[in-house]
């Protein structure tokens, strides 16, 4: 599927060039990935986070032949609450649920800066190269979860064991 998506993007390049000469590779990549991952929705992402994600996956696609799709991006508070309530029901406790899903008031998805990506190879590429775009994996237990974090000045934020873990407070970073 990766090869056919790449071939499709190459075929779309002339049309993309006519539409946006300076951004043809970006546009052709987004079109091809949109066909490859038709259910993905980038709406609601913080505009800077969306731009960073699109730039990262365009570079991954053209430079390394790697596909990066979005499984979940922005969620409204009601959807996040539904997911959290379901996880509480499934795990039996609020604390156990927080290991996988946060309530809306704490969720980076609700703020529009979190992206759950696929496939695993795409997540691996993003883990290796995402810092160039201020995109970082933030939880040990979620290989797919990345956040747009420009405030870290190019340094990876401290990765937490899981979403509900208490942040480690220290005067210095390791």
What do the predicted segments below correspond to?
Residues 2-174:
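Cell-envelope/glycan interface and biosynthesis
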């Amino acid at each position: 599927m990766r090869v056919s998506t790449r071939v499709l993007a190459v075929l779309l390049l002339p049309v993309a060039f006519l539409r946006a000469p300076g951004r043809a590779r970006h546009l052709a990549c987004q079109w091809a990935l949109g066909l490859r991952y038709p259910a993905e929705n980038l709406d609601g992402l913080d505009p800077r986070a969306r731009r960073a994600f699109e730039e990262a996956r365009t570079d991954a696609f053209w430079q390394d032949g790697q596909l990066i799709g979005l499984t979940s991006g922005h969620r409204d508070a009601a959807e996040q609450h539904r997911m959290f309530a379901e996880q509480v029901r499934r795990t039996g406790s609020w604390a156990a649920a927080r290991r996988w899903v946060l309530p809306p008031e704490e969720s980076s998805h609700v703020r529009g800066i979190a992206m759950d990506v696929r496939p695993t190879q795409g997540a691996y590429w993003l883990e290796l190269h995402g810092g160039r775009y201020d995109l970082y994996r933030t939880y040990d237990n979620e290989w797919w979860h990345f956040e747009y974090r420009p405030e870290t000045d190019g340094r990876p934020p401290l990765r937490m064991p899981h979403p509900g873990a208490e942040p480690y407070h220290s005067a210095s970073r390791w």
